[in-house]
Amino acid sequence: MGQRYNSNFLRIAFAFVSMLLVYYIAAQIVAAATIFEVLLGLNYQHGILASVAVIALYITMGGSHADIMTDGIQGIMMVLIALLIGVIFFMGVGFEGTGPSMINNALVIQDPSLGWDNYLKEGDILFGSFWLISLIFVAHIPFAMNPHIGKLAFALKDPKQIRTFLLIAIPVGSILGFTVLGGLHARALFGDVIRPDQAIPVLFTQLFPPFIAGLLGVGVLSAIMSTSDGLFISIAVIFSNDLYKKTFAPVIHKSKSKEQIEQIALNISRVAIVLVGVVACWLAWNPPQFLAVLLWMGVGGILAGATGPLLIGSLWRRATKTGAIASFLVGVISFAVGIVYCFVLKEVPFKNPFAVAGSCIIAAAITMVIVSLMTKPLPKQHVDDMFGESA
C-alpha cells in the first residue's frame, strides 16, 4: 500500500491495523480447541494451549515455505470434507427417510422461522431485514484484501498464472461453501443444545464410527491449520518487514549490513509469532457464542481500511494518495466507533459486526472516489509502474 501511493503513513498505519488479524487467529484457535474438545475429550482450555503450541512450532520451524507447500495438501482435505458434508446432507443421513426435505422438516418442527422458505427473521440482529443481509455480502467484497490471503498471489511464479489460479480457486471456493450445510444438518438432528461452533465435529462423532470421525476431524484441523499458519506468517511479516526493515532499520540501523538486518528481522518475526500466540490465547480463553463475531471484530477493521487504498486502488488508476489516506481513516475510525458502540456499551442490543463492517466499507469506498476526483493524481510514470505498463 505504501508503495502504491508513495506513502509511509499508509504503509505504517495499515501495518498496525493489520495486527487486528490476532482476532482472526483467536477464532481459529477456538475452532481447533473445539475439535480437540469434541473428538478427544480434552478440556477446552487445554485444547487452546495445544492448538497454539502446534501451530506456533510448525510456523517457527518452517516459515512461509512450509505454509505455502502444505496449504495445497490441506486444501485437498478441506474439499473432500466439504463434499462429504454435502453428500450426507442431500441424502438426509441420520433421519428416517432420504433427502434434504427431512432436514427441513426437522428444522421447521423446532422453529418455523428456520424453514427454507423464510429468508428473513424479524427482530434478528443478523437476518432481520434485507438491508442487514445485504451488508453481509458487502462486508465480504474486499475479503481478498486480507494480508494472509493477498500474499498468496506472490507465490505465483508468473503473472500469467493468475488466470489458472482463478479458474481453480472459484469452483473450489464454491465447494467449500457446502460446509454451511453441516450446521443445518447438526441443528436439525440435535436442536440447539450444542454450542453452534461444535456443530460439525458433533455431527461427525454422532454419524460415523470413532475412527472415521477422527479422520474427518483431521480434515477440519487441516482447514484451521491452513488459515492459522498464514495468519501467523502475515503478522510476523508486518513486524519484521513492514515495520522494521522498511521503516525503522533505515533510521536506527544505518551502519548494519544487509545480512545483519535480515537476521534481526528473522528474530523479530519469531518473537512476534510467540507474542501473537499469547494474545490470541487470551482472546480465545472465553470466546463469544459465535466464532464469526470474534473473527469479524478484527477482519472488519482491516477491510474497512483496505477497501479504498487496496481494492479500489488496484482497479482504478485515478486513485490518489490523498483519497487513499482519507478513505483509510474514514473506514478504520468509523469501524472502531461502530464496534465500541455495538459491543462495548452493554445496553446496546445491536451486536452485528457484519453490519458495522459493511457500512464502513461503503463509507470508505465513497470517500475514496470523491476525494480522489477532487485531488491531484499521482504521476503517470508511477501509476504505469504500479500497473505494470511502463515502457
Residue ranges and their predicted role:
Residues 2-391:
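Membrane-embedded helix-loop-helix hairpins and adjacent transmembrane boundary segments
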